[in-house]
């Protein structure tokens, strides 16, 4: 017995209709944005709602240095990130800016507020910009995760820059490949 597929033998791609997380605050934010999507004709709210459903991997964090870079010349607008804002010690001067995010690390929040900026939550944003007016929607770098470094063509294949999964970093483990007989081959 097979299964009856309606779309002529293709199973449709699935997409999330609710967050997987049991976080009650996230669920309340979703409830609020569901209402806004239904009652307003704003694309911004739809994007926010879709991103609230995403998995943690797809809600990449954004560092203060990138935030400052992206917001240069847009200091009067509100930066919006569905994810975490993290501190970056490499940046010394922070302009006063308004930032909305799901969470802020302790130091990032302290530094933004010390510079005369504001750290907003999504329910505060909904009151200030119900249609997303004067906002800059940002995303963190998804491919900066450690795990992503291992993806791609197999390590050892020509022109591959994938990181091998190595048990240890010692002399005997994937060191001197091509220079020593015992380590793969010798040229």
From Swiss-Prot:
It holds the Pfam family Ribosomal_L18. Residues 160-170, 177-187 have a biased composition (Basic residues). One of its GO terms (cellular component) is plant-type vacuole. GO terms for molecular function: mRNA binding; structural constituent of ribosome. It is found in: Cytoplasm. It comes from the Eukaryota. Residues 151-187 are annotated as: Disordered. Ubiquitous. InterPro entries: Ribosomal_eL18, Ribosomal_uL15/eL18, Ribosomal_uL15/eL18_sf. Keywords: Cytoplasm, Ribonucleoprotein, Ribosomal protein. Interacts with NIK1. Interacts directly with EXA1. PANTHER family: 60S RIBOSOMAL PROTEIN L18 (PTHR10934), LARGE RIBOSOMAL SUBUNIT PROTEIN EL18X-RELATED (PTHR10934:SF25). This is Large ribosomal subunit protein eL18y.
């Amino acid at each position: 017995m097979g299964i009856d597929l309606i779309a002529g033998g293709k199973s449709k791609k699935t997409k999330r209709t609710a967050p997987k997380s049991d976080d009650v605050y996230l669920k309340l934010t979703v409830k609020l944005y569901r209402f806004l999507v239904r009652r307003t004709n704003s694309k911004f709210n739809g994007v926010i709602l879709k991103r609230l459903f995403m998995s943690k991997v797809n809600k990449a964090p954004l560092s203060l240095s990138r935030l400052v870079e992206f917001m240069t010349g847009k200091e009067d607008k509100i930066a919006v990130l569905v994810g975490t804002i993290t501190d970056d010690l490499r940046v010394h001067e922070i302009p006063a800016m308004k930032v909305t995010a799901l969470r802020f690390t302790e130091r990032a929040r302290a530094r933004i507020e010390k510079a005369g900026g504001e750290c907003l939550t999504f329910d505060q944003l909904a009151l200030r910009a119900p249609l997303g007016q004067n906002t800059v929607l940002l995303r963190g770098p998804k491919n900066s995760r450690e795990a992503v470094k291992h993806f791609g063509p197999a390590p050892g294949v020509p022109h591959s820059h994938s990181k091998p999964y190595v048990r240890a970093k010692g002399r005997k483990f994937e060191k001197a490949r091509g220079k020593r007989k015992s380590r793969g081959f010798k040229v």
